[in-house]
Structure formats: C-alpha cells, structure tokens
Curated annotation (Swiss-Prot):
Name of the protein: ADP-dependent glucose/glucosamine kinase
Named cofactor requirement(s): Mg(2+)
Lineage: Archaea, Methanobacteriati, Methanobacteriota, Thermococci, Thermococcales
This enzyme's EC code(s): 2.7.1.-, 2.7.1.147
Organism: Thermococcus litoralis (strain ATCC 51850 / DSM 5473 / JCM 8560 / NS-C)
Pathway(s) of this molecule: Carbohydrate degradation; glycolysis
Keyword Cytoplasm attached: yes
GO BP, one annotated term: glycolytic process
Ubl conjugation among keywords: no
Length: 467
C-alpha cells in the first residue's frame, strides 16, 4: 500500500477544501440556468409509530399486510396507501405510488403534514440554484397556485408569463394563479423505525403522488410557445421529470407526444449552444425507457444511480452487466458508463451512489473532480441541515467525515489503472473522475439530495471550466 489510510484521508481533506473554494469563486460565472419540467408541492410527514399502527388497525391489519407482499404500485384505497408505506419501511426503499382515488386524496389531506416544501426535481433545483447559489434560474411550473408559489425562496428565480403577446420573466410569487395544488405526500422514516414487527433497515421515504399534471409532463403555454425566447436567457439547462411517462393516456395521446415536444426543446437548446443535463430517474415502463435512451445523444450530460444505470444496460441488451451494476461492483459500473458513452456519444456521465461518485467525460480537467467534491459537500450540508439558505453553509460540511470504505475502493482503482492521480484516471480518449463522498450519519431529511448532487456538480463544473 503506497499510502496509509490516514495519508489518503488527509489528501481528500485538502482536495475538498480546494474544491469548495474553486466552486465558490466559479458559480457567479454562470449566467443562467433553465429547469424543466416537474415542479410540485412536497407535503412531508415524519411517521409516528403509534399514529401509523392506529391507522393500520382501524382499516384492517390483515388487508394492509397483504398489500406489503402483493404491491399494486398504485393507490386506489386506504389499505393500499398504508400497505405501500409499510412495504417501503420493510425494504428500506424509496417508493412512489400514484393516488388514483379521490377518497384517498381527501384522507391524505386530512392526515396532514409536518412541513411543506417546494417539490419536483425542477422546483427543488430552482430553490438551490436560484435561492442559495444566486444563479439566475428560469423554472417551469405546470401550475402556480399560492400554496406552491410561496414555497419558492427569494432570489433570482423566474417563471415566464405572457403579458399580452410579450413574454416576461417574473418571480413565481408575482405570477400566482387560481390553479391546482399538485401535492406529493412524503412519508419519511428513520433507520430502525418500527411499526408492528416491520423494521426499517435504513432511512427512506414513501411518496403518495396526488398530482395529475406532472404525471403526464404537462407543459405550460409559455414553454410551448415561447421556448426559444426563454433559451436566449440561459447557458445551461437541466431536464427532469420524464420518468413518469406512460405509454398511453385515456385521451388517446401517448408518451411520444410529450417526447416529440421535449426533442424540439432540445433542438432549440443545441442551436443556441446551451449545455443540457438530463437527470435520469428510474423509469418503470420499458418502452418509455427505450425512448429516453434514444434521446440521450441530444443531451450534453446525464446523471444517474446504480438502479438507473442497470435499467439502461437492460435496454442496451447487457443483462449480465446490469446485474453486476446492481450488485455494486465498481468496475462493472465503469464498464457500463463506457458502454453508455459508446452507444450515445454523450459527453458527460455523472454516476452517484451511496459512498462515492464517478464522472466519465470526453474532456479532461480537475474541474470535473472538484465539481463532484463540491456536490458531495452540498449534499452533506443539505442532509445535516434539512435545508440550505446560503452557499456559505456548505462550508460546514467540510467537517463531515469522508467515507473510508470508498477510500479502499480507490486502492482497487489504482491497481487497475496505472494513470490514476488524485481521483483522476486518464483513459486515452476519456477521463474518469472518482471521489469518496461525505456521509452524514443521521440525516435530517433525504428529500432532494439526488437533485442537489446532480445540479451542484453540473453548474459548478461549467462555472469552473468557463474561467
């Protein structure tokens, strides 16, 4: 072993400090970011054992427990709602089921929430990039009722509105409309949380989604008709929310109708040389997933985790590699990233998992690694505080320990790749960046961590490379 574990930890500490300063100085260079398409209201409830047991007992424990073993993956009754929550606890897995029944929607509303936050990947990133990083940010809101608009923080966050025939950019609070409240009910539980004999192996959340607009990737008229004008105000775009698409809708439209519009937006972004990042999220429908993979060549960058990367390998036709990626083998992950780049020609792939991040790029530079380190700090700070208000708060995460298990992985990478230094691997026509992340022992909240990681890395890397 060339260096002791202590030496490596010291090295990463130094790299983290430098990366934070570099990102802090570079972020003001970013002149504008566009975020689309999913914004909603997150109603967060921290589950209480007694309350949950009482509700399960009232509705019928046997019926609810049956749902745990045979999940419908959608909610049309209260027992399905409670069964879904218990299944998520039992497996320690994040799950999201759509609420089809009005009766359950009323029940959810009456059950209430502990706090409201802006939700949806675009909405969460808007409060971070515009509110915390102070980057001028244009965000798509399918609906903009008062309850949602007030969840946007102050700062350079804008929604486009038509005044007569002119498109204006105003803060969401100045564009409130009598529109629908799109609520995602999020039930959070800590590691070890127990209800009856069901115990959570790790902290996570169950989402009951009562939102008909984002479920079909509804696009506002301003985005349908004024997209080119919006594009002129930005250098970067982050697209998310397409994972919910269904093959067919009751009104006769299909996922293709939505993706054709997305593709026309990407063509405009590319014409204006706007760099675009696609936040891939697990897409249940195979045909939709195939179509999303086909769209990747139009993007500059994609962000994903092991479940999403494996699901793409299945589409590409490498079942064996998909399995190995799910099992968490780092070399399989690297192979899969290379396969994805070969297949799509995409310039940048950002992989995030518990403990480490990787970025495979068709260009070189320490900025790629520094952006990953900054993203790790931002995620740790958000996990510690539950919410970020100022970019300076991210500095506090420097004191969070770096994941030592990932530092051991670094040794394996060194053995495999001769050209490996300070987390950077030269792969002839590509560069691979590896960073061990900061792990917060008991996070205040897990909502929006993935969005924080991807958007922080994408914008800070762009800012640093622009200097």
């Amino acid at each position: 072993m060339k260096e002791s574990l202590k030496d490596r930890i010291r090295l990463w500490k130094r790299l983290y400090v430098n990366a934070f300063e570099n990102a802090l100085n570079a972020i003001p260079n970013v002149k504008g970011v566009l975020l689309a398409y999913n914004t909603n209201i997150d109603a967060i409830k921290y589950l209480d054992k007694d309350d949950l047991e009482k509700r399960v007992t009232e509705i019928g424990k046997e019926k609810v427990f049956e749902i745990i073993e045979n999940p419908p993956e959608k909610i049309s009754s209260i027992e399905e709602l409670l069964g879904g929550i218990l299944r998520s606890i039992k497996l320690g897995k994040a799950m999201e089921w759509f609420v089809e029944s009005e009766e359950v929607r009323r029940y959810l509303r009456e059950w209430g929430w502990d706090e409201l936050r802006i939700g949806g990947q675009a909405g969460i990133m808007a409060n971070l990039l515009g509110g915390v990083y102070r980057i001028p940010t244009i965000v798509h809101v399918p609906q903009n009722p008062k309850l949602q608009a007030e969840l946007f923080v102050d700062g350079p966050i804008y929604v486009p509105v038509f005044e007569g025939n002119k498109l204006k950019l105003v803060h969401p609070k100045d564009a409130i409309a009598e529109e629908e409240e799109l609520i995602h009910y999020i039930y959070e539980f800590p590691r070890g949380f127990q209800v009856f004999d069901v115990q959570a192996p790790r902290e996570n959340r169950f989402i009951a989604n009562a939102d008909d607009y984002n479920a079909r990737v509804y696009m506002r008229r301003e985005f349908r008709e004024g997209f080119e004008e919006i594009t002129r105000n930005v250098e970067l775009a982050i697209i998310s929310g397409l994972q919910v698409l269904k093959e067919y809708y009751p009104d006769g439209t299909t996922y293709r109708d939505v993706l054709d519009r997305v593709e026309s937006h990407l063509n405009i972004l590319n014409r204006y040389n706007v760099k675009s990042h696609f936040e891939f999220a697990y897409t249940a429908n195979r045909r939709v997933r195939e179509a999303l993979v086909e769209l990747l060549p139009k993007f500059t960058s994609v962000g994903l985790n092991e479940v999403e990367l494996a699901s793409i390998m299945e589409i590409i036709g490498d079942e064996e590699l998909a399995k190995e990626v799910l099992e968490g083998h780092i070399f399989s992950v690297i192979d899969a990233m290379n396969v994805l780049m070969d297949e799509t020609g995409i310039e940048r792939i950002h992989f995030h998992t518990y403990g480490y991040y990787l970025a495979l790029t068709q260009y070189r530079g320490e900025e790629v690694r520094d952006a990953l380190l900054f993203a790790s700090l931002a995620a740790a700070a958000k996990a510690m505080k539950g919410n970020l208000e100022r970019i300076e708060q991210i500095r506090d995460a420097l004191s969070v320990p770096t994941n030592e298990r990932a530092i051991v992985l670094e040794e394996e990478l060194e053995k495999e790749f001769t050209e490996f230094e300070n987390g950077l691997i030269d792969m002839v026509d590509r560069q691979l960046a590896f960073v061990p992340t900061k792990i917060v022992a008991s996070p205040k909240s897990t909502v929006g961590i993935g969005d924080t990681i991807s958007s922080s890395a994408f914008v800070s890397e762009f800012g640093m490379r622009k200097r």
